[in-house]
Amino acid sequence: MKVHVYTDIETLFGRACRVWMDTLLDAGHDIEFIDLGTNTDAPLPNVGQADVNVLVAGIYALPRFAKHGLPRHGRHVLWMFDPLTKNEASVHRHKASLFDALAPHLHAVMAMDASIERYVAQHFPALAVFWLPYLVAGKHVRAPLLETQRNRGIVMLGGDTPRRREAEKRFLASPSPLNAEFIWSGLWGAARDACRAGSRISLSIHADAEHTYFDQFRAFETWALGTAVVSDHFEGWESFGIEPGLHLAMASPQDMPQVCAELLADVPRREAMVQASQQLLREKFSPAAWQGRMLSMIESVA
């Protein structure tokens, strides 16, 4: 089978693409990777025929597909990591509009969580939907840095929103001095990995309070690099095998400075959290654990 794997942000979704490429190559399929880049206006490249197109698409590829259509050949499967909501008060609402324009032309969706499964079932009941969370290859799960090797305290990597700005103000106003960095943009690839690996705590804060979800990409990549996560509250952690307090600390933004201060002072606890979270990645979220299901998904669509 000939499979094309597309993405738009290689420095963000590149590892997710390689998970698919390695899995399909190991099964004897013919694979080609197409990096669309971040241009939302250019026509799609002419890369020839394929039986299946796996689209690991974000905010650049979705409008490009909506404008120029999907690849001309093959059947189309979208691996959806962005949250979907029609709530007009949420900063995520535009992603649903982009998805809705694309959905009638898809043959299947791989949903990162149950909320996306429900969205597709409600609005596009004829569209096949599978659950496939973000996966991390074992070769990307690194030994954690020693405490003395870490060069950052608390780090938040993500888009700038009013809710996150409020969280930043709370850290700045904390009675105990906390070395917290809120980095809104400009850090990708190896530099992003180094930042996460060198930090003692990585924050995961919802962009808004209207649509909350488990940010797998942020948490799993951070765990793989050996750093503890303090997360905003989210539902559905049980379905991922996550135990708050064991794999991550969970707190509301107003409580995060205190939770982080306590965690910074407790190196053994942070080390235990990293060990538990990396074990969870290896057991539940490695490509090896999902290989059979991944191949079955592709074969059912082809």
What kind of region is each of these model predictions?
Residues 75:
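Non-catalytic, usually N-terminal nucleic-acid engagement modules in DNA/RNA processing proteins
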Residues 242-254, 262-267:
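Conserved acidic donor-binding segment of nucleotide-sugar-dependent glycosyltransferases
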Residues 222, 248, 277:
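Hydrophobic, well-ordered secondary-structure elements that form the walls
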Residues 46, 195, 259-262, 297:
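CheY-like receiver
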Residues 1-50, 57-68, 78-240:
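Nucleotide-sugar donor-binding catalytic core of glycosyltransferases
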Residues 228-232, 246-252, 293, 297-302:
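Short, contiguous hydrophobic alpha-helices characteristic of membrane insertion segments
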Residues 264-298:
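A charged, aromatic-enriched C-terminal amphipathic alpha-helix characteristic of glycosyltransferases
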